Design a protein with these regions (language model features):
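Conserved core segment of the aminotransferase class I/II
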Residues: 221-295, 299
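A generic structural signal for short coil/turn motifs at secondary-structure boundaries
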Residues: 36-38, 173-176, 263
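Alpha-helix N-cap/helix-start motif at coil-to-helix transitions, marked by capping-box chemistry
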Residues: 38, 42, 46, 66-69, ...
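N-terminal small-domain helix-loop-helix segment of the aminotransferase-like
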Residues: 5-97, 278-285, 299-300
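Conserved core of the PLP fold type I
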Residues: 58-193, 204-222, 294
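Short glycine/serine/proline-enriched coil/turn segments at secondary-structure junctions
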Residues: 196, 206, 234-236
Length: 308
């Protein structure tokens, strides 16, 4: 069961992705996707034309399993700048977005009946992915600084998790951000108790005021962390393009996924388009635009709620 947006219990999962626009004058807060005016058709048209102007035939082939090398190099540069920490392109594995990444990780690093620790509450559709793999969900309480480490330690005394799923920055639905100290504690506990940390960092780059603590992607050298990123929130969900940043040994295990061995690089064409968007500076300028626009909208909504 899951909670509907009206707060009532529902036995059916809600569909949260659609193509239709809300009625005039309606702002739909029940769907985690950009408004129509923040879907950059012109930008992507420019990037696509730039790619096709110089495209080589083999660039339309299946592509290497880890993802296009040129795209991964461009993405590594973006993350290095954003994280203020070196990111190696070999640590990046291209995905079709964070939902697919989470599904891959559950299938590759957990077995039916295994425990997965999550923040309580957490992104409600992640529950369905865990259920698809027969995983047992164990909730860990949070406060204003994110997942409570003492509660995690206590739960580790009675449960052995295969995975810990966390949304460290700008949590959905709670809004809190995991402090730097707690991020380090989670990483240390993952090594001590031999579980993998799945950090859903889809909001890490969408800071409107102060920057969040360093991404958990900067800790992947520890060996037990998989950092999930996506262009769904910082460009367009329809691109279905994202990445997993992790250690070399975990990348090797991801390369063993059957669908990767069969089909090669995921969203290979889209990867080329985004590489050109990055190289042209379009991705960086669009991200600045999103931050400023969302900051203004947050301030407008906050002021309206305070008036009420």
């Amino acid at each position: 069961m899951c909670f509907g947006y009206d707060g009532e219990m529902s036995t059916k999962p809600r569909t949260v992705t659609f193509d239709g626009a809300p009625a005039p004058g309606v702002i739909n807060f029940g769907v985690g996707q950009p408004s129509e005016d923040l879907l950059p058709v012109g930008l992507l048209r420019t990037a696509t034309a730039d790619f096709m102007a110089t495209a080589q035939p083999l660039e339309l082939n299946y592509g290497e399993r880890q993802g296009d090398a040129g795209f991964r190099a461009a993405l590594a540069n973006v993350l290095t700048s954003a994280y203020e920490h070196p990111v190696n392109d070999d640590s990046l594995f291209v995905t079709g977005g964070n939902s697919q990444a989470l599904d891959f990780i559950c299938g590759q690093f957990a077995s039916q009946g295994d425990n997965v620790f999550i923040e309580e509450p957490s992104y409600f559709l992640a529950h369905q992915i865990f259920a698809d793999h027969g995983l047992s969900v164990v909730g860990i309480p949070v406060d204003e600084d994110g997942l409570i480490i003492e509660a995690l330690v206590e739960k580790l005394r009675s449960h052995r998790p295969a995975l810990l799923y966390t949304i460290p920055s700008y949590h959905n639905p709670g809004g809190q951000t995991l402090s730097a100290e707690r991020r380090r504690a989670v990483a240390a506990l993952s090594l001590e108790h031999d579980f993998l940390v799945v950090a859903d960092e889809v909001y890490q780059l969408l800071h409107y005021f102060d920057k969040p603590p360093p991404a958990m992607g900067t800790m992947t050298g520890e060996g037990n962390i998989l950092s999930l990123g996506s262009f769904s929130k910082i460009m367009a969900p329809g691109l279905r393009l994202g990445w997993i940043q992790t250690s070399g040994n975990l990348v090797e295990k991801l390369l063993g996924i059957g669908v990767i061995n069969s089909g090669g690089s995921l969203n290979h064409f889209t990867s080329h388009v985004m590489r050109h968007a990055i190289d042209l500076g379009l991705q960086e300028s669009w991200l600045r635009h999103l931050r400023e626009t969302y900051r203004q909208r947050v301030e407008t909504m906050d002021a309206a709620l305070r008036r009420e």
